[in-house]
């Protein structure tokens, strides 16, 4: 599959559905999460890989590269 992976810092529990950061590497996402945690967002965030890559969209389960 082509395209750059996207790593996200997302909220959990009451903040589920909120994306706080989108990063090009897992390490950068972890750094973003650390900064967020230092600013009051402890224990409510997770780092995860996006189901899409950069410049992709999904329609009815089909991935389309832009």
Task: Give a label for each model feature.
Residues 1-19:
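Short aromatic-glycine-(Arg/Gly/Cys) micro-motifs in beta-strand/loop hairpins
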Residues 8-10, 22, 49-50, 54:
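Functionally constrained cores in energy, signaling, and assembly domains
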Residues 13-15, 23-45:
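A short, charged, amphipathic alpha-helix used as a generic interaction element across diverse proteins
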Residues 35-66:
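Short, mixed-charge low-complexity intrinsically disordered segments
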